[in-house]
């Protein structure tokens, strides 16, 4: 017969015992628990194991009970401490709430007092304004104000009257002086005009008599129909020399120099008048006058 040796299991600290070994061990333990001799150095006392085992069990039970009681006491202490902490926290919260309530009540009281003070100030201002208006609306103040205005206006009117009188006198003097100066100037101008009239009567009026508007109109009509041999054409403008008053006179007198001016129909008449006046003034002074031809331009 081959015997099978069982290997001990892994991770086991105790050695593996066979079934017979286990039975023997249990029997030995039981015998030891029934009768056990205990020797003591001083006095040898033999005591049965049963009583000692019971005492040990009781002691163990008592110790366990004491431990449980201690644990219960500790738990109770912990609970009481937690309750105390909770109570303390509640007390702190209550104190904070009371403080905030006190602060809020103080603020509301101060606001109410400020509002009351403002209302009192406003009432005082209203009373003062009412008193002022009553004083202004009283008949005595109105009468006094009207009297003062009347006296001020009368004083101002007197001063203005004095100033107006002075200004009128100054204006009269200035007018008289101006009239005298104008009379002197008029006399001088009359004398000069009389001398000029005498000179003009001696001079010939042939130049003014030669200017006729009808001839100018006829010439304008001719310009639209034909161009004479003295004129010339341009791409943009049509210049005609025969339509000029001064040009026609110079053809008769054989001038030394001729000045040509080109103008629109609306400006041509004004230019001719100005040039005639200028030429007459130059002739009166004894100066030589150059002839000018004013030509019409057609756009």
From Swiss-Prot:
Bias kind Low complexity: ranges: 56-89
Biased composition (Acidic residues): 150-169, 177-212
Span of the signal peptide: none
GO molecular function terms attached to this record: histone acetyltransferase activity
Region of interest: Disordered: 1-30, 54-89, 148-212
Disulfide bond residue pairs: none
Comp. bias intervals (Polar residues): 1-10
Protein name (database record): Uncharacterized protein DDB_G0284311
UniProt source species: Dictyostelium discoideum (Social amoeba)
Organism classification: Eukaryota, Amoebozoa, Evosea, Eumycetozoa, Dictyostelia
């Amino acid at each position: 017969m081959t015997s099978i040796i069982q290997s001990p299991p892994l991770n086991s600290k105790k050695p593996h015992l066979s079934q017979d070994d286990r039975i023997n061990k249990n029997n030995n333990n039981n015998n030891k628990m029934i009768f056990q001799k205990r020797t003591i150095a001083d006095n040898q006392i033999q005591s049965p194991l049963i009583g000692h085992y019971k005492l040990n069990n009781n002691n163990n039970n008592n110790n366990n009970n004491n431990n449980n009681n201690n644990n219960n006491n500790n738990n109770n202490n912990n609970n009481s401490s937690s309750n105390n902490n909770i109570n303390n926290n509640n007390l702190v919260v209550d104190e904070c709430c009371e403080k905030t309530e006190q602060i809020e009540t103080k603020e509301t009281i101060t606001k109410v007092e400020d509002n009351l003070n403002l209302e009192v100030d406003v009432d005082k201002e209203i009373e003062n304004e009412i008193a002022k208006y009553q004083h202004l609306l009283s008949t005595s103040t109105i009468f006094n104000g009207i009297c003062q205005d009347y006296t001020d206006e009368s004083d101002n009117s007197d001063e203005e009257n004095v100033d107006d009188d002075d200004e009128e006198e100054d204006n009269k003097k200035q007018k008289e002086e101006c009239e005298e100066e104008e009379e002197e100037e008029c006399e001088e101008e009359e004398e000069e005009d009389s001398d000029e009239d005498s000179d003009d009567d001696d001079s010939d009026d042939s130049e003014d008599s030669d200017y006729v508007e009808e001839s100018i109109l006829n010439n304008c009509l001719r310009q639209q129909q034909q161009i004479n041999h003295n004129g010339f054409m341009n791409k943009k403008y049509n210049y005609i020399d025969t339509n000029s008053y001064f040009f026609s006179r110079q053809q008769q007198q054989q001038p030394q120099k001729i000045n040509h001016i080109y103008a629109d129909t609306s400006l041509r008449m004004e230019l001719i008048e100005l040039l005639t006046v200028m030429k007459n003034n130059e002739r009166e002074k004894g100066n030589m006058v150059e002839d000018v031809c004013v030509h019409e331009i057609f756009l």
